[in-house]
Amino acid sequence: MTKSELIERLASQQSHIPAKAVEDAVKEMLEHMASTLAQGERIEIRGFGSFSLHYRAPRTGRNPKTGDKVELEGKYVPHFKPGKELRDRANIYEE
């Protein structure tokens, strides 16, 4: 599901709220979550999961085109850990 698909689905379920208001709310929520993570803070949504930053240590990588070794700096990357309720709901899914 993309961001625009999420907005469309929420707008169709909440017909009393203008689609533009739903779009603005979703964009504002995502922007607030991104800025919270950028400040190094953890986000926890009970029953859904938590977002945090994990540190990746410096390492030697490879350029996929040339195969040459490349030194990669350490960096922080976003990490999502699903909550128990989300894990349980996703576990029922069968292809």
UniProtKB/Swiss-Prot annotation:
<dbReference type="GO" id="GO:0005694">
    <property type="term" value="C:chromosome"/>
</dbReference>
<dbReference type="InterPro" id="IPR005685">
    <property type="entry name" value="IHF_beta"/>
</dbReference>
<keyword id="KW-0233">DNA recombination</keyword>
<keyword id="KW-0805">Transcription regulation</keyword>
<dbReference type="GO" id="GO:0006417">
    <property type="term" value="P:regulation of translation"/>
</dbReference>
<protein>
    <recommendedName>
        <fullName>Integration host factor subunit beta</fullName>
    </recommendedName>
</protein>
<dbReference type="InterPro" id="IPR020816">
    <property type="entry name" value="Histone-like_DNA-bd_CS"/>
</dbReference>
<comment type="function">
    <text>This protein is one of the two subunits of integration host factor, a specific DNA-binding protein that functions in genetic recombination as well as in transcriptional and translational control.</text>
</comment>
<dbReference type="InterPro" id="IPR010992">
    <property type="entry name" value="IHF-like_DNA-bd_dom_sf"/>
</dbReference>
<dbReference type="Pfam" id="PF00216">
    <property type="entry name" value="Bac_DNA_binding"/>
</dbReference>
<dbReference type="GO" id="GO:0003677">
    <property type="term" value="F:DNA binding"/>
</dbReference>
<dbReference type="InterPro" id="IPR000119">
    <property type="entry name" value="Hist_DNA-bd"/>
</dbReference>
<dbReference type="GO" id="GO:0005829">
    <property type="term" value="C:cytosol"/>
</dbReference>
<comment type="similarity">
    <text>Belongs to the bacterial histone-like protein family.</text>
</comment>
<dbReference type="GO" id="GO:0006310">
    <property type="term" value="P:DNA recombination"/>
</dbReference>
<keyword id="KW-0804">Transcription</keyword>
<comment type="subunit">
    <text>Heterodimer of an alpha and a beta chain.</text>
</comment>
<dbReference type="GO" id="GO:0030527">
    <property type="term" value="F:structural constituent of chromatin"/>
</dbReference>
<dbReference type="GO" id="GO:0006355">
    <property type="term" value="P:regulation of DNA-templated transcription"/>
</dbReference>
<keyword id="KW-0238">DNA-binding</keyword>
<keyword id="KW-0810">Translation regulation</keyword>
